[in-house]
Swiss-Prot record:
Protein name as annotated: Glucose-6-phosphate 1-dehydrogenase, cytoplasmic isoform
Biological source species: Zea mays
Taxonomic superkingdom: Eukaryota
GO molecular function: glucose-6-phosphate dehydrogenase activity
Family as reported in the entry's similarity comment: Belongs to the glucose-6-phosphate dehydrogenase family.
Keywords of this entry: Carbohydrate metabolism, Cytoplasm, Glucose metabolism, NADP, Oxidoreductase
Lineage summary: Eukaryota, Viridiplantae, Streptophyta, Embryophyta, Tracheophyta
Residues binding D-glucose 6-phosphate: 11
Length: 15
């Protein structure tokens, strides 16, 4: 994880 996880979580929440 890391910074990538931050974006993935935000996108997943929107999806």
């Amino acid at each position: 994880x890391g910074r990538n996880e931050f974006v993935i979580r935000l996108q997943x929440s929107e999806a």
